């Protein structure tokens, strides 16, 4: 039986480590992804936040195929705030696009904070 060289031992150890690291994460992300995706629709809301009326609820149709709100509409003082649900379940809006939040209500509140009293202007959709 030939002597084991350092190169052969290193190659074997690297192969074992690569196989172990490739097999280990396959079960964990599936479990966390299942826990993260809640397939229930967000609750409707209608409240005054910092003097602005914010509303949200299931979208009433309209036939817009380009909307990404997942069938959910949000309004600030009667003007639609375009929202989008990310793949990880967080929400963003056109006003606070780089600050994902947990719910459409939080997206509306973040938009009010960002607007600092300025009116929300209608977003052109073509």
Swiss-Prot record:
Gene3D superfamilies: protein ne1242 domain like
MF-aspect GO terms: copper ion binding
GO BP terms, alphabetized: melanin biosynthetic process
Ranges for region Disordered: 21-71
Record field: compositional bias (Low complexity): 21-34
Signal peptide: 1-33
PTM note: Predicted to be exported by the Tat system. The position of the signal peptide cleavage has not been experimentally proven.
Keyword annotations: Copper, Melanin biosynthesis, Signal
Matches recorded under InterPro entries: GriE/MELC1_sf, MelC1, TAT_signal
Top-rank taxon, per record: Bacteria
Keyword RNA-binding attributed: no
Claim: Ribonucleoprotein is one of the keywords in the record: no
Main function: This protein may function to deliver copper to tyrosinase.
Protein name according to UniProt: Tyrosinase cofactor
Organism, as annotated: Streptomyces galbus
